[in-house]
């Protein structure tokens, strides 16, 4: 569904649509340098709510060949929005895409990199090693549910995970 819309970044506090695979950069992990490509994840929206940072780009590390494939299909965006094409693509994903097995997830890890630059041009970056993305998502969701269930009074409204659980929640 997202292929038809291209990419999304936040610039000067506003969400801005950009082409699919709009920008790439090298991500300097401790174990290797990887190619990152911009992706329209929800973090483009939520990170601004949590931090107030006005300019946000989210990257995913992929092989350079994947970046090239994504850029080749940019012109197909309008076609990808048609219901029959959507149905075909969804059926292909359902048949061909499988997540990792429990055995593979057990020992897998995810590396998260972040970088921030202030108005004076000073930069800071950090790298965090977590369990694989599937496991991390489940553990985080269960922790949030436990907090909500234990609350003495209802916690209403909209929260990002870090606004509800604290900025260091991912470290617990």
Kindly label every feature range from the protein language model:
Residues 1-172:
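C-terminal catalytic/substrate-binding lobe primarily of soluble NAD(P)-dependent oxidoreductases
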